[in-house]
């Protein structure tokens, strides 16, 4: 939701219009439900909880995002407040399973559910982290940004390369580099394509020294979704088993109260 919200804002705008963002998010849910409901079943809304467990393992995880926000003129308190309001509305009024667990990210929720189910699953996300879940043939992914299916011919190999290279957008350095190199803007040790092609077919113990092996395991725990802590896995399962709070019979009143007039005519698609 944050990504779609930012895309809807002009460069000079410091706040968001909650009515516009609400309409945009709900219309997207309607559209994807119409497109995929018949083959993949009902929507499940997976949201980030606060205080990701990954920061306990790696305190610099996503640290650069806060730095970027602090340097921005946008009113992040107002923006996140609007998003929290909309998330609360989705949980309270809509007939979909809504999962948000303290210390878990949406990635954890999606990873746990994808591993638990054998029926067809469609993940709606542009995040390539989910390619690793495609080791199961029932898991597919659609990118709202490219409007294309996201896939890879070898998800296991993709995951290992991801661990080797790290993920600069999340503040995770490659396995040859120190923890703080991204935050401190220190150039990472280069990794060539030729080296990666050699390493992905080996065990890390075969090509890493002690420090590199430590960094490899650092990245593996942050990136590989099978490392979601067991207590979080249990909480995700419990929330999934709960009956949704919202009912379709209450949607009309919600749409009228929020002046979602353009969506009322499509209410049956929710």
PLM-predicted stretches and their roles:
Residues 1-88:
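Domain-level signal for Mg2+-assisted phosphodiester chemistry and nucleotide/NA-binding surfaces
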Residues 10-12, 39-40, 67-254, 261-265, ...:
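Extended two-metal-dependent nuclease catalytic cores across DNA- and RNA-processing enzymes
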